[in-house]
């Protein structure tokens, strides 16, 4: 597929500081093409691995390689569990990622939990918490082991925070545990449907089983990290499988308690961008506080003759998303102080 760069992406008004890659919803499975649950969108299960290979080749060949790649969750498809192919498929995708010459940060989505328990994921190669940054003398910025979240610094004065959008969820947890019972109670209070994956008739359609939320503990931790970033004049990028801003997403795909997450973010000045996957269609909106919400288009529903990934170029005054295939270009200016 021919690619022509848009002129404004390369009319650089200031020096580029660094870049990072983004890719979402690979959902690989060794299966023939299929369709989504509604039967109206084609899914390219095998070809998703070729799209990933193409993205990695591109990042490896960049004249100035990205500092890291953000993998936004749903790395293999839930169908793998049905065919007892979860570990084999994960191994194939992880072997492909080994060709990447820069670190990759893995986010967990619903399809990770269709295939594996939380305990399994914690002890797997999908746990990239070892790449975290630890802030000396600030114990409040150390995340709990109860959820999968951490922060890291790819470049001075830029902090990236990876959130666990299934910290509150009925997926991947032992059904006899108090946590499962608590989350099931929350889900049933908002969703009376027999089929908990159905949003039919719901006032808050995000309360479905394939979504999840952020615990108060995780949001308190997020608040502590953002407080540190405010004080130290850092710019912050937040990463989550689930989106949190309604204007950038189908309402069925939002995190359960997206309002709570927004309230924390909006109480700080440091956050410039929030990247998510999950929707497959992508989406974008700048909120009233100047935070850019970007949902990256899903690899799984990308035709073989197209692509779905991006490279974000970071400048002192803005970020530029250079999209490939289905992923559009975007210029995201930082809010004026």
From Swiss-Prot:
GO molecular function terms attached to this record: 2',3'-cyclic-nucleotide 2'-phosphodiesterase activity; ADP-ribose diphosphatase activity; CDP-glycerol diphosphatase activity; manganese ion binding
Keywords: Acetylation, Hydrolase, Metal-binding, Zinc
Pfam families: Metallophos
InterPro entries: Calcineurin-like_PHP_ApaH (IPR004843), Metallo-depent_PP-like (IPR029052), MPP_ADPRM (IPR041869)
EC number(s) from the headed UniProt entry: 3.6.1.13, 3.6.1.16, 3.6.1.53
Keyword Cell membrane carried by entry: no
List of residues that carry N-acetylmethionine: 1
Binding site for Zn(2+) 2: 74, 110, 241, 278
Cofactor: Mg(2+)
Quaternary structure and interacting proteins, as annotated: Monomer.
Protein name: Manganese-dependent ADP-ribose/CDP-alcohol diphosphatase
Native species: Bos taurus
